[in-house]
Amino acid sequence: MNKIMVLGSTNVDYMMKMEKFPVAGETLDALEFKQSMGGKGANQALSAHRLGGDVLFITSLGNDVNGSNTLSYFKDEGLNVLPLIVENVPSGSAMIWVNSKGENCIVLNPGSNHEFTPDLINRPDIENAIRDSEIILLQMEIPYITVKKICKLASELNKIVILNVAPARELDSEILKMIDYLVVNVVEAEMISGIDYDGSNKELIIDKLLDLGASTVILTLGKHGSILKSSRYNKSLSAYDVEAVDTTGAGDTFCGAFAAELSKGSKLDDALHFATAAAAICVTRMGAQPSIPSEKEVRDFMKNNKLN
């Protein structure tokens, strides 16, 4: 039995670091180039796994070299994976630019991730795996209709559903009512709530998301920390003071860490603090999955560093 099931995307990331982003027609030399595994689903699954969670990852891969290499990589990491192989479609990939401020721009080639359709999960082994899990963790790099179906099934089975609405998109109230923890950044929160963030209306936006049906909202604010709020609970947490070199994968690391700590029976305060520390370590390193810390690294970091 896996306590955490992650369903989502897998990409091969092609990352270039540069002093600044080019404008149209401009050619720049990259300062650094790396190829690594990524995808929000894979990032979150690996984060939860490295940080002590018992994880099963379900993802859609092409029958190609990237798909084969991805499975070998997951095996080396010790991550339990149930791959859904699709023919004649390439595995997902992403081109990531990172500037000297640690900011990123990402262009996705969804490939097999867009083939992760409801028909692909109409299998007894997947339904049984959901039934045997405690926490279901999802993102938005697979089709919305698939995410909605999984949320519905998990909700009917009284599982804890965590949805990270990344990439940002609108959600209907039906799916919001199926979610136990809605994890969003400012851009994602604006899109769902319909309220523009002005720097001072965080609570207004969160309350709107709760009114729309979410049980608990976690609003991540980067270097300004995070807020976790429900009808019975309201916790604000500041961030760690670290020098960010690459924010790619920070949100995914946060989500995986939160799920991992929650699966161990930790209190919400502790899970939020642990996830914040894991994300803080992540942004000090280059790459998505290469930057995900181990559980020991996070525990040591929390002992030796204080929140702002």
Predicted regions and their residues:
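Conserved phosphate-binding/catalytic region of the ribokinase-like
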Residues: 1-4, 170, 201-308
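Glycine-rich phosphate/adenosyl-contacting loop at the front of the ribokinase-like
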Residues: 1-61, 65-69, 75-76, 244-245, ...
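Alpha-helix C-terminal capping segments
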Residues: 45-54, 98, 260-265
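A glycine-rich helix N-cap at a beta->alpha junction
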Residues: 77-88
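Conserved phosphate-binding/catalytic loop of the ribokinase/pfkB sugar-kinase fold
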Residues: 86, 96-135
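Conserved phosphate/ATP/ADP-binding segment of small-molecule kinases
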Residues: 151-234
